[in-house]
């Protein structure tokens, strides 16, 4: 294909790649990523979650993972800040009785002090002092994150010199932030895994 044809194809892909919630089916089969993390985010949560506990899923996306937990709706809360996902959550979560709040500022989450037994967060922003405020004594924060060096080799190949979007999202710095917030017993494992692009459209 010529350069012009490729550009036309890629722009066409860009125009239709509007992801809602946690649905990445549009790029299914276009990349491969090892799925052998030394932990299981869902299993960890299920291992400690009890029906009577107050649960918050911060940055819930489209609520897909939250709903998969099957937690009693009256004890379930969620936040989301991306407008298309907020609307999606209003349609999916609110009618069930889940307490949904629109929020895009991890330092000012609109819930009262000591509201939750467990706060979960997958790939969303977070602020340790705010988490400390929201959690009941003995409460838990469980998160799975992407580090500041995620896909760095690819970024440098395509856009050399691009600044890291989340330069502080690394294990030593985050460990210290939680310790400084007080009240946290920190267990932060890390893992690096490769990703292989099958098609440029997977970007």
Walk through the language-model features, giving the residues of each.
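Short, glycine-/aromatic-enriched active-site segment of Class I SAM-dependent methyltransferases
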Residues: 147-165
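Short alpha-helix
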Residues: 166-182
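Conserved S-adenosyl-L-methionine
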Residues: 183-194
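Class I SAM-dependent methyltransferase SAM/SAH-binding core
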Residues: 54-108
């Amino acid at each position: 294909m010529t350069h012009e044809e490729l550009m036309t194809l890629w722009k066409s892909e860009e125009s239709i790649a509007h992801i809602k919630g946690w649905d990445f089916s549009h790029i299914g089969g276009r990349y491969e990523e090892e799925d052998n993390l030394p932990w299981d985010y869902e299993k960890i949560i299920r291992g400690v979650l009890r029906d009577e506990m107050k649960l918050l899923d911060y940055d819930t996306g489209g609520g897909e993972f939250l709903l998969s937990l099957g937690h009693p709706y009256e004890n379930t809360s969620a936040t989301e800040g991306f407008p298309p996902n907020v609307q999606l959550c209003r349609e999916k979560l609110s009618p069930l009785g889940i307490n949904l709040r629109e929020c895009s500022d991890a330092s000012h989450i609109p819930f009262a002090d000591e509201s939750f037994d467990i706060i979960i967060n997958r790939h969303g922003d977070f602020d340790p002092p705010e988490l400390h405020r929201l959690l009941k004594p003995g409460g838990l924060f469980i998160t799975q994150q992407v580090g500041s060096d995620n896909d760095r080799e690819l970024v440098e190949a395509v856009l050399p010199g691009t600044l890291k979007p989340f330069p502080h999202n690394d294990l030593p710095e985050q460990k210290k932030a939680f310790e400084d917030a007080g009240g946290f017993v920190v267990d932060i494992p890390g893992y690096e895994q490769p990703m292989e692009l099958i098609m440029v459209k997977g970007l």
